[in-house]
Amino acid sequence: MSDLAIGLRQVRAEQRAFWRNRAAALFGFGFPIMFLLIFGTIFNKQSTCVDGTIGARGQCVGGAEVPYNNFFVPAMAAWGVITTCFSNLTIGVVNRRDNGLLKRLRGTPLPSAAFVSGVLGSALISAVIVVALTAVVGHLLYQAPWPAHPLPALVTVLLAGLVFCVIGLAITPFIPNADAAPAVVNFTSLPILFISGFFFNFNNAVFADIAKVFPIYWFKESMLTAFGAKPSSGGWNGEDLLVLLIWGVLGLAVTLRFFRWESRRA
């Protein structure tokens, strides 16, 4: 059997395992949809400032004022990708490592590359599904427009999903055990989500500058561009994608250097 066929079979196996794990599926798909329903209902018919700041009188300065859900739907879609490709993947890999599953896999004929490709491929499939589901819910319930630039949106989701998968693998060596994994994942993602303006315009220059260091901010911006909430030329923003690529390369370097197949207790 070719390496490609083995990799595809591993993707299918990972997808089956994902959907059988109801908690992981609910967390990956349920959280973004739940927050979309809550915030989308509360702020429906209101507007927000995109790519600008809010002035003293509440006006949008240096940006565009758009309906709130036109902004919030792509933001929640981005969060769904981060959840499936970073949070769920990281916690799952650490659990497998602590349970000894990764060590046992190394002793089987299954190539390591096939296992990793299966994990990444399954996460990317889930990411595309959660983005599509979020877009459908936003359109049907809140009349948010469909992605204005479908191809850039798909490319952005796949690129960012791969980047966050790699970053997730990169931090697993620094998580001591499976019990600590959820806390570490939430600590490294949730605060950045808030200061990156996923829920509302975070009108603070200091926090905005901090957010721009991390890929979460740039992914949100690229999704806003692809969905049409931000003006662009064809739905692409080279700066956003370049920062994501840089983080992907850094994550890959750390993964290749430090990734462990065995628990420290082994």
Per-range role (PLM):
Residues 112-185, 233-245, 249-254:
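Alpha-helical transmembrane segments and their short interhelical loops
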Residues 1-31, 265:
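Aromatic- and glycine-rich beta-strand/loop motifs that create alpha-glucan
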Residues 34, 38-39, 65-141:
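Hydrophobic alpha-helical transmembrane segments of multi-pass membrane transport proteins
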